[in-house]
């Protein structure tokens, strides 16, 4: 820095001051080049930057320099060489015109908006006259954005012309692939380029805004009219006061629907509703207590909310015109809550008192909603096909896997081996059938009947089993309700019709009479009297009839005498008393006949003296054809 002495003071330390404005202390530059020639200039400033007055040009020199033309000194200037040729793709490389535009898109099937404004950027590439349309990506817009039209040359009309940068301007409409774009503005480079090419640009326009987007950007306005209703007072007054209603939801009209019971709680403190489901034990449902959580329930929605799918609707005060209140819950009234209809059939005593004090409603009777069980459907059996018994055929319809009909085990145990035998004749117009005799065996254990025809020599009719064990249906019964013959239907003179054949009962044995007398309640007095009279007549025959019978059948008298002799001779023999029951066990058809081999096996097991000469004679007289023996007369010789 320069120290300048103050005038009038000695040049001593402390009397000089530094000038802070002077910082350059080099010598002035006098040598330089001008138009390629080295020249020397006189210095104009000294050391420290002080201007030198003696090296300045005079006014005359300045005027001479101002009036003297350079041509007089340097001559005519040379013409500049022509510029080199530059191709368009090199000259306009990476030079792009940008225009701001928008297009309008229709929005069908929407209650919120009818059209949508979509803003785009149109890029024009000068190097190859191609264009592209790009829509700026907006977050959470819900539509596909980005590159709408890729870079390409775009057709302007149907004649094959393409868009050129001369066709683009602000404030015009351009149609690209059937979609009209409105150009509103461009960037600074585009404006300078078009103006340099002599194109007059239209004034810029304001970018159109999407009405729905702007609506969503606005804050939610709530115009609430001041009300004199005090919610705090309601909360404090009705705290812990709940109305309880009993309701049902009847969904039986739909497939697999049912009627389910619910409890509706209405909280008076804040007008909220809660629905609980009533579960029963083993009802097959998850024991989740709540069907609907505690909340306010809308009663009347706005018009748009009715058409809009309620499954995605967030209910607020803006979508609801009226909410459910306590006066809407009345016994005997149906309510639709969130799409489900509930019928209120009862309430608790507190709710009845509240409605009486608040609304003056006293008639709230309980409604009986219990449904009576429908009568059981009577199973209709298919027609009887004629095979087997009706019970056997019907058993195939009761289960997928057929089972045998259930039997009365007690009856079978009580009446085991109890057989009632009757002698009958066939009622037939054929003369040969009048002399045929049949033995009816009625099995009390199973109510079945078997018929056996004793074989008669030289009769021309094969005897033996006539009908196996089966139940015989009465002629006046139907297939759907069959009535079978029972013990009370068999008496002297009774007509038994067996599958179209009529038989007349002629005789019976003493066991039948004993059974009828012990079970007189099952028989009519006439039937019991007929059996008793018949047995009485049979035990006291007339002398003339006996003499005639002896003359007619001498073999019977001989058989009776032989039986009496055997009874006297074997009086003290140790044979068993149940010999008759032993033969009946092996006589499955209750015909009174057993095979010869089986006969001797039974006699051997019961210690019967078959080797005795009288017993051999009795066996010979009781023998019949086909190797069978009539054990009825044989057993008489061993009975007491």
From Swiss-Prot:
Effect on the protein upon substituting residue 259 to Y: Risk factor for JAE1
Coarse class of the protein's main subcellular location: cytoplasm
Residue ranges of every copy of the EF-hand domain listed in the record: 574-609
Cystine connections: none
Outcome following mutation: residue 253 to Y: In EJM1; reduces substantially the cell death effect; reduces partly the calcium influx; normally binds to CACNA1E; does not affect subcellular location; results in impaired cell migration
Consequence of changing residue 353 to W: In EJM1; no effect on protein expression; no effect on the spindle pole localization; defective mitotic spindle organization; defective cytokinesis
GO CC annotations, alphabetized: axonemal A tubule inner sheath; axonemal microtubule; axoneme; centrosome; mitotic spindle; neuronal cell body; sperm flagellum; spindle pole
Result after altering residue 631 to C: In EJM1; no effect on protein expression; defective mitotic spindle organization; defective cytokinesis
Effect of residue 436 to C: In EJM1; no effect on protein expression; defective mitotic spindle organization; defective cytokinesis
Positions of region (Required for its localization in the mitotic spindle and interaction with alpha-tubulin): 1-45
Bias-annotated ranges (Basic and acidic residues): 538-554
Annotated region described as Disordered, given as residue ranges: 535-554
Alphabetic keyword roster: Cell projection, Cilium, Cytoplasm, Cytoskeleton, Disease variant, Epilepsy, Flagellum, Repeat
Effect annotated for changing residue 485 to H: In EJM1; no effect on protein expression; defective mitotic spindle organization; defective cytokinesis
UniProt xrefs under Gene3D superfamilies: 2.30.29.170, EF-hand
Tissues in which the UniProt entry reports expression: Widely expressed. Not detected in lymphocytes.
Impact reported for residue 153 to Q: In EJM1; uncertain significance
Residues covered by the DM10 domain: 93-198, 239-359, 416-520
GO molecular function ontology, one term from the record: calcium ion binding
Outcome after substituting residue 372 to W: In EJM1; no effect on protein expression; defective mitotic spindle organization; defective cytokinesis
Record disease entry: Juvenile myoclonic epilepsy 1: A subtype of idiopathic generalized epilepsy. Patients have afebrile seizures only, with onset in adolescence (rather than in childhood) and myoclonic jerks which usually occur after awakening and are triggered by sleep deprivation and fatigue. Juvenile absence epilepsy 1: A subtype of idiopathic generalized epilepsy characterized by onset occurring around puberty, absence seizures, generalized tonic-clonic seizures (GTCS), GTCS on awakening, and myoclonic seizures.
Function according to Swiss-Prot or TrEMBL: Microtubule inner protein (MIP) part of the dynein-decorated doublet microtubules (DMTs) in cilia axoneme, which is required for motile cilia beating. Microtubule-associated protein which regulates cell division and neuronal migration during cortical development. Necessary for radial and tangential cell migration during brain development, possibly acting as a regulator of cell morphology and process formation during migration. May enhance calcium influx through CACNA1E and stimulate programmed cell death.
Subunit structure: Microtubule inner protein component of sperm flagellar doublet microtubules. Interacts with the C-terminus of CACNA1E. Interacts with alpha-tubulin.
Official protein name in the record: EF-hand domain-containing protein 1
Source organism (scientific name): Homo sapiens (Human)
